[in-house]
Design a protein with these regions (language model features):
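Enriched for short, Lys/Arg-rich terminal
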Residues: 67-68, 72-95
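Basic, Lys/Arg-enriched alpha-helical interface segments
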Residues: 1-58, 74, 93-95
Length: 95
């Protein structure tokens, strides 16, 4: 079993998603957060479950029709890098 590590950026993304949804529907915010937790936990046993990412050396896992988790694998760790809304440009355009 791989270790699951959340980067500070991914934690911030998750909190932002929760806060945004909670404004209109607290129960939906809990449901989405639980879904993100459940789907990412599966990566501990199946780390290559996601498709190859658009950023080199990453993977992408759609956890909900609106959200995708970007992660990489480093030795015995699955590192959650970002959670991205599927309607957003990913990777972001460089300025």
């Amino acid at each position: 079993m791989m270790e699951l590590l959340w980067t500070p950026e991914a934690v911030r993304d998750r909190e932002d998603i929760y806060d945004y949804i909670e404004e209109d529907n607290p129960l939906a915010a809990l449901a989405i957060d639980d879904l993100i937790a459940e789907r990412t936990a599966v990566l501990q046993d199946f780390p290559r479950m996601g498709r190859g990412g658009r950023v080199p050396d990453t993977f992408e896992l759609v956890v909900h029709s609106s959200y995708m988790v970007v992660y990489d694998i480093v030795e015995t760790q699955v590192r959650i890098l970002n959670i991205v809304h599927t309607a957003r440009q990913w990777p972001p355009l460089e300025e």
